[in-house]
Amino acid sequence: MASSFLPAGAITGDSGGELSSGDDSGEVEFPHSPEIEETSCLAELFEKAAAHLQGLIQVASREQLLYLYARYKQVKVGNCNTPKPSFFDFEGKQKWEAWKALGDSSPSQAMQEYIAVVKKLDPGWNPQIPEKKGKEANTGFGGPVISSLYHEETIREEDKNIFDYCRENNIDHITKAIKSKNVDVNVKDEEGRALLHWACDRGHKELVTVLLQHRADINCQDNEGQTALHYASACEFLDIVELLLQSGADPTLRDQDGCLPEEVTGCKTVSLVLQRHTTGKA
């Protein structure tokens, strides 16, 4: 999904120059470019900062996470190029607006600002020390962390509804509730979002599978006309997009803004998968 933010030839050293006729060594020597070297070092430091952030999520404020999210997208994707989300009135719009507000900000500036905030969150951070491997470091900020951007308030067990359990990915509770018929698998919240919408938004693939097994309406639309496929696409969960398509989701359904699922994502791979599936059914 990421678009290159390095100048052409920055990785290979190719400056576009030609070998002079007097050089018979057979090896091309390119002029040393401090600018390219500086950009490469900045990009490397940015990637280290993104990896380090995974251990700082709990200490970062909501505003800081939004700030970091926007700059991560600016570096990896470029200028905001997706329609304003309508599937998630609060969180989705805030994330989109934070990214959109950067306008034509350069990737270099975005990387510098991102690194500065990570350093502020952890003044003792040493980029030279490798990050610990494992579950915490498996996802780059801006990937699966997109929807889990905020720390949600702790809700007492007795105050939880079925959507709270869905957000928590409590498969056992949801399965029992559906099997006992205490809850309709297609029940909707006040915004018209079904459990399947929520599971797709949060990236809970196993829960998505369970809901589909219990005959969740795969093409159910919320109050804005968006399907679960719109949600999975917008959040860039490729594996869930593929699961939905394999299970019969309709990629040709448009929301109230006239957008197809392929048009609400910033991920080229997700968009291509949806386009190919649509073409194959035509």
UniProtKB/Swiss-Prot annotation:
SMART domains assigned to the protein according to its UniProt record, in alphabetical order: ANK
Pfam families from the UniProt entry: ACBP, Ank_2
Subcellular location: Cytoplasm; Nucleus
Region (Disordered): 1-31
Binding site for an acyl-CoA: 69-73, 95, 114
Gene Ontology cellular-component annotations: cytoplasm; cytosol; nucleus
Tissue: Detected in placenta and spleen (at protein level). Detected in placenta, umbilical cord blood, CD34-positive hematopoietic progenitor cells and bone marrow.
SUPFAM superfamilies assigned to the protein according to its UniProt record, in alphabetical order: Acyl-CoA binding protein, Ankyrin repeat
Residues the record lists as Phosphoserine modifications: 106
GO molecular function: fatty-acyl-CoA binding; lipid binding
Keyword Phosphoprotein among UniProt keywords: yes
Role summary: Binds long-chain acyl-coenzyme A molecules with a strong preference for unsaturated C18:1-CoA, lower affinity for unsaturated C20:4-CoA, and very weak affinity for saturated C16:0-CoA. Does not bind fatty acids. Plays a role in protein N-myristoylation.
Subunit comment: Monomer.
Annotated disease: Neurodevelopmental disorder with progressive movement abnormalities: An autosomal recessive, progressive disorder characterized by global developmental delay, intellectual disability, significant expressive language impairment, behavioral abnormalities, and movement disorders including dystonia, spasticity and cerebellar ataxia associated with gait impairment. Additional features include facial dysmorphism, oculomotor anomalies, microcephaly, seizures and brain imaging abnormalities. Parkinsonism may develop in older patients.
Protein name (Swiss-Prot/TrEMBL): Acyl-CoA-binding domain-containing protein 6
Name of the encoding gene: ACBD6
